[in-house]
Amino acid sequence: MTLTASSSSRAVTNSPVVVALDYHNRDAAMAFIDKIDPRDCRLKVGKEMFTLFGPQFVRELQQRGFDIFLDLKFHDIPNTAAHAVAAAADLGVWMVNVHASGGARMMAAAREALVPFGKDAPLLIAVTVLTSMEASDLADLGVTLSPADYAERLAALTQKCGLDGVVCSAQEAVRFKQVFGQEFKLVTPGIRPQGSDAGDQRRIMTPEQALSAGVDYMVIGRPVTQSVDPAQTLKAINASLQRSA
């Protein structure tokens, strides 16, 4: 285990907002990042950007003060998933995720891989049902449960394996907080401020509604990244959340 030089320089934010960086152009991504403040949000780096630009891109974001959610959704045999999660922790990310459908042994191995990192370990979150999926999509896979019921089953398995929480839809958050408790973190994509286009997300909610539902961290993409004034958009979202708290 190595310590990242950037870990001590990152700003602390109390905002639940995580901005999804969905860029295929590095310069465009950095131009956006230069406009926002790490005190107003965290950043999510997904498969496309990580594949294009690698760990060094994450380090650059950390050096600018941002906490990083490394959204790679590891899903592999237990040993491979565990090594991947440990590599993410070594990079100094704030949060990393795996697919709950990888099963109990995989999730337990991932959790154990973070033990040596102690308090510096990232939050380990499991993906339940992707927010783009509907009942018909699950039926195609032979799953007869509704998206909500299947997500709850996977969330229960995630908690049993000792992970920190799950990625879920905002509609599932109320039920999940009741069933799994306040300490079980809920991370929700598909959050759109009032008036935003739904895009490719099927199960969406506004930031205020998500907060009220019990969401701990809300992932917001294009409404911020495509804003004419992203810094002001973030401040407006955070202000609305403070009023709703």
From Swiss-Prot:
Annotated GO CC locations: cytosol
Molecular function via GO: orotidine-5'-phosphate decarboxylase activity
Biological process, per Gene Ontology: 'de novo' pyrimidine nucleobase biosynthetic process; 'de novo' UMP biosynthetic process
Catalytic residues, chain numbering: K73 (proton donor)
Catalytic activity from the UniProt record: orotidine 5'-phosphate + H(+) = UMP + CO2
Organism superkingdom: Bacteria
Pathway(s) of this molecule: Pyrimidine metabolism; UMP biosynthesis via de novo pathway; UMP from orotate: step 2/2
Keyword tags: Decarboxylase, Lyase, Pyrimidine biosynthesis
PROSITE patterns: OMPDECASE
Key word Cytoplasm present: no
Binding positions (substrate): 22, 44, 71-80, 131, 192, 201, 221-222
Entry keyword annotation includes Glycoprotein: no
HAMAP family in UniProt: OMPdecase_type1_B (MF_01200_B)
Assigned protein family: Belongs to the OMP decarboxylase family. Type 1 subfamily.
Subunit architecture: Homodimer.
Role this protein plays: Catalyzes the decarboxylation of orotidine 5'-monophosphate (OMP) to uridine 5'-monophosphate (UMP).
PANTHER family on file: OROTIDINE 5'-PHOSPHATE DECARBOXYLASE
Name under which the protein is recorded: Orotidine 5'-phosphate decarboxylase
